[in-house]
Regions:
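Substrate-binding/catalytic subdomain of NAD(P)-dependent oxidoreductase enzymes
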Residues: 176-209
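N-terminal helix-loop segment corresponding to the beta1-alpha1 unit
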Residues: 1-181, 210
Length: 212
């Protein structure tokens, strides 16, 4: 059976949860996803929990089914190789790497106008934020935990990373469809904080808390 994204190649320059989950989701839909890591591995390559062999179960779970490329991201030659993987491939990149001007939409669009660039952020203004800090900032710890506990309790599920990764995968699918129809690329930014606030609004949890 032909998978929905069987003819699509996606380059993923990422680490941790949201962006790798986006790539994993696209891979499970049939896309060829190339996970790019720096030499020695990204900061999540040995993240707990570890198997007896020392391999990160976490990393393996989020990157199964992908191709892997280890490239020197600091060298001009390595940066050019990654750009070529993107622009000479299907022109789709997903990243949560910040501050890499050579990997920006603007830079890639100079050689491929219809590039689809998806950037995952902590916060919409570009400042840092991870799942548990965003969760605390949005007020969700006030509505999680035991009913008899008055104080805020953070949950253990990286919910906003997961939601953000799935939203990002949907954004790629939508952008590819639009490009197929119009030839237009896309610059897409998705922030964990925005995802959390949008989800809170949709579920009405924080409003319910006010009424309580």
């Amino acid at each position: 059976m032909t998978m929905p994204l069987a003819d699509l190649t996606v380059v993923e320059v990422s680490s941790f949860v949201a962006a790798p989950l986006c790539g994993l989701t696209l891979s499970q839909l049939g896309a060829e996803v190339i996970r790019v890591d720096p030499i020695g591995g990204a900061s999540d390559v040995r993240r707990w929990p570890l198997a007896a062999s020392g391999t990160s179960i976490y990393w393996t779970g989020l990157n199964k089914g992908k191709r892997s490329a280890t490239i020197d991201l600091r060298s001009p030659e390595g940066q050019e190789l990654i750009r070529r993987l993107i622009v000479e491939g299907d022109g789709v990149v997903v990243t949560n790497a910040a501050g890499l001007s050579w990997l920006s939409f603007e830079q890639l669009a100079t050689t491929r106008a219809d590039v689809i660039h998806v950037q995952l952020l902590g916060r919409g203004d570009g400042s840092t934020g991870v799942d548990y800090t965003v969760n605390a900032a949005t007020g969700f710890p006030l509505v999680t935990g035991p009913a008899n506990q008055a104080g805020p309790i953070n949950h253990v599920l990286p919910a906003w990373d997961v939601c953000c990764g799935l939203y990002a995968a949907l954004a790629v699918v939508a952008a590819v469809r639009r490009r197929d129809q119009s030839g237009v690329g896309a610059k897409i930014s998705i922030a964990l904080e925005d995802v959390a606030l949008a989800t809170a609004g949709n579920l009405g949890w924080l409003l319910s808390l006010i009424h309580i």
